[in-house]
């Protein structure tokens, strides 16, 4: 591997390269085009996100389905909240004053029981495009792609970090087996094992996105179908269990103890929802 640092050219000889350099990194771009198949879906909307100096007014995430578009309330710390609005894909942050953001946020997030997010000073705001992306296979020779270098999910399902951690766990097991026993078994299985999990997350994230967002070409039929989906989800134990399992994340197919890590923790799942 050759690179320049401080104006000087350097060379590093290594057994493997872990491509954990993100969606815009050089690792995936270094793979010959014919060796990769790219699957991609770009959504016709984006998320306008804000960081706010205000204590969370709820200890749960709140997903809001509203006739004006999706909104999300989340927590960053005891003193900072993070909120999102669905906006057009070509929207620019410069078009949104702080007052306009709060007007729209309160319109979409104020619940029937009177709950609403605490208004505070906006300390950061940005617009993030929505896409689903997978590059396969996730291995080319001795280069292994991991995390956003190999896949992007729409953030509605909150799966991006989970997938990256699962990739690295699988890769760690492969490296451990190679250096301890000289076997390539887990490295050879890396791409197939990870992609199975990636496509499950893509399916869930696409469903969450489709269920909660307004699409430009939505008909009255589509809107009523979305409401029926949410009605079923919030009134069926089976549906809520399925959502919780997928949202929290299915157990990794890689045993944690196999790479010297603590056993995978378990936790309860709770979800708040507001339908406007």
Where is each model-derived feature located?
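Hydrophobic transmembrane alpha-helix bundles
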Residues: 18-26, 79-84, 102, 116-127, ...
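Conserved FAD-binding catalytic core of PHBH/FMO-like flavoproteins
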Residues: 1-126, 130, 135
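A sequence-level detector of short, solvent-exposed, charge-rich linear segments
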Residues: 27-38, 42, 46-50, 67, ...
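C-terminal helical "tail/cap" subdomain of flavin- and related membrane-associated enzymes
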Residues: 158, 173-276
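Well-ordered, non-transmembrane segments within structured domains
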Residues: 72, 133-142, 267-270, 276
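Conserved mid-domain beta->alpha element of the FAD-binding
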Residues: 18-19, 126-207
């Amino acid at each position: 591997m050759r690179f320049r640092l401080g104006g000087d050219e350097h060379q590093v000889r290594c057994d493997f390269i872990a491509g954990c350099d993100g969606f815009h990194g050089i690792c995936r771009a270094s793979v010959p085009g014919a060796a990769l198949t790219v699957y991609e879906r770009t959504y016709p909307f984006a998320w306008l996100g804000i960081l706010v100096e205000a204590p969370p007014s709820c200890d749960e995430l709140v997903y809001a389905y509203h006739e004006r578009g999706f909104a999300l309330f989340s927590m960053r710390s005891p003193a900072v909240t993070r909120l999102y609005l669905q906006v057009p894909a070509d929207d620019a942050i410069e078009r949104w004053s702080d007052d306009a953001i709060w007007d729209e946020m309160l319109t979409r997030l104020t619940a029937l029981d009177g709950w609403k997010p605490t208004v505070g000073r906006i300390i950061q705001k940005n617009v993030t495009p929505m896409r689903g992306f997978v590059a396969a296979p996730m291995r080319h020779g001795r280069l292994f792609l991991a995390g956003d270098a190999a896949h992007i999910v729409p953030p509605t399902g909150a799966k991006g970090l989970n997938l990256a951690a699962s990739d690295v766990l699988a890769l760690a097991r492969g490296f451990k087996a190679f250096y301890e026993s000289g076997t390539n078994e887990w490295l050879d299985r890396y791409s197939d094992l990870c992609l199975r999990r990636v496509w499950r997350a893509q399916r869930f994230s696409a469903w969450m996105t489709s269920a909660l967002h307004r699409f430009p070409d939505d008909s009255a039929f589509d809107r009523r179908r979305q409401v029926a989906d949410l009605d079923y989800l919030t009134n069926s134990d089976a549906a809520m269990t399925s959502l919780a399992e997928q949202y929290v994340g299915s157990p990794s197919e890689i045993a944690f103890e196999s790479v010297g890590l603590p056993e995978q923790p378990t936790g309860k799942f709770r979800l708040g929802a507001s339908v406007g």
